[in-house]
Amino acid sequence: MPSLKDIRNRITSVKKTQKTTSAMKMVSAAKLRRAEIASKAANPYSAQLKRVVSSLSSRFGEDDNPLFREPTSNRTGVILLTSDRGLCGGFNTNLCRTVLRQLTESGVSDAQFVTVGRKGNDFIKRSSHTIIKHYGDTPPGERPRVINEVVGLMMERFVAGELDRVLLVYSHFVRVLTQQPTIETLFPIEPPEAEETDEREVLFEPSPEQILGALLQKYVQNCVFTAWLDILAGEHAARMTSMEAATKNAGEMIDKLQLYYNRSRQAAITTELIEIISGSESL
């Protein structure tokens, strides 16, 4: 049976942990708000770029651009976006398990991974797949450079025929309590569907071929960028939820320990009183 001192020390320890988890929850909430603002700010550009690419790509076929080439085998590249830090529940684990299960069902045993985020890299290292490039702890100012490098690397391998398809894997941020593991095909590029029909004839200068060639890489880079924004928002939402649950659990544990302490102290006092009374009666 633990002593009263041991119980007091345990209560103090849990209270310190509760303060830490509560602070982490507030920090994650603030970061989540900033991530949501950044995601909303990127939406107009993404929508307009999607509209232009949709209009242009409808004019061309597979033979007009190698990025439209249909796969002839199952050689697969994967861009995996995860967080660098943990303490966010099953946020990263669920995503990694989803992509590995999907690859297994597709008969892919040795995909080429580019991992962005330490958690995904650590997970894939334990699998049969190959990591050809890893980016971890990327500061905000370096994200555009990393995106350009990742897209350029995978595009080069796809055009050279080393890969037949390239997948983008991330957790789509739906709401605070919902992050949906998502697998999208980056290459071959699947032209986005037009959101609305515009019957007006559009004049392009220079030629539509040149404009489409310049925009396709920008379009893919933007897909990766918006997915990264989703990952950031989802990470902070998952961590905020996890820390809220941890703070609540710590509070419940403190209440139980305090009750146990009070009962133990009362029992100790009662025992001492009985001993005193018994001693006085013997005199």
Please name every model-derived segment.
Residues 1-283:
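C-terminal beta-strand-loop-alpha-helix "lid" module of Rossmann-like NAD(P)-dependent dehydrogenases
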